[in-house]
Amino acid sequence: MSCCGGSCGCGSGCKCGSGCGGCGMYPDLEKSTTFTIIQGVAPMNNFEELGEKAAEGGNGCKCGSNCTCDPCNC
């Protein structure tokens, strides 16, 4: 994805941000991973996938020309 020359990221409200975080809505959450492990008599559940889906956030919002979001459907 383009980040408008490294100076743009789509921020809240699909407006231009100051950093190049992959042009996601919440660049600080894109690389976070959450693990929950509960062991006992019940089967072990791993909620890693749920955390990744919640962290995506961008929903197709990416930086276009002139530091604007294209498409703007955040």
UniProtKB/Swiss-Prot annotation:
The keyword Lipid biosynthesis does not apply. Keywords: Metal-binding, Metal-thiolate cluster. Signal peptide: none annotated. One of its GO terms (molecular function) is metal ion binding. It comes from the Eukaryota. The keyword Cell division does not apply. Pfam families: Metallothio_2 (PF01439). Metallothioneins have a high content of cysteine residues that bind various heavy metals. Belongs to the metallothionein superfamily. Type 15 family. This is Metallothionein-like protein type 2. It comes from Nicotiana plumbaginifolia (Leadwort-leaved tobacco). The lineage of its organism: Eukaryota, Viridiplantae, Streptophyta, Embryophyta, Tracheophyta.
